[in-house]
């Protein structure tokens, strides 16, 4: 197996379209590529754009990454996202506040909760889509 690592820039996280030429060139230079791993939700949310720009159709290039969002859900629906971790951003924001309140009021220790242990794939994305589109997952 050959692994090609592309160095991203902070601008690519805020404007994923700026990565189109980099990703397209890497895929053109590696025509046997089977999977593209994205490092964040912004990039995975742009999976369809990356694939189409490089000449790939739905389900022709596996794309995986992190986070759920309306854009990532759209990529699942259209066949351009295949696996992502569900970090449950609502819980990531809510649990620290709950933990601080319990520590202050009850004197308890901090809550240690893994919110990113779940995975969303092509078989189960529909079960989280409504909550992801609402910004809760």
Q: Can you name each region flagged by the protein language model?
A:
Residues 1-137:
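A residue-level marker of the well-folded mature domains of exported/periplasmic proteins
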């Amino acid at each position: 197996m050959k692994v090609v690592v592309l160095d991203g820039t902070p601008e690519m996280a805020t404007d994923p379209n700026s990565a189109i030429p980099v990703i397209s060139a890497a895929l053109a230079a590696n025509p046997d590529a089977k999977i593209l791993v994205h490092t964040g939700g912004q990039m995975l949310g742009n999976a369809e754009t990356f694939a189409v720009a490089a000449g790939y159709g739905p389900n022709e290039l596996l794309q995986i990454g992190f986070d759920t969002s309306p854009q990532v859900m759209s990529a699942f629906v259209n066949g351009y996202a295949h696996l992502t971790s569900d970090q449950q951003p609502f819980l990531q924001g809510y649990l620290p506040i709950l933990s601080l309140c319990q520590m202050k009021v009850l004197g308890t220790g901090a809550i240690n909760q893994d919110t990113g242990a779940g995975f969303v794939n092509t078989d189960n994305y529909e079960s989280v889509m409504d909550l992801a589109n609402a910004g809760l997952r």
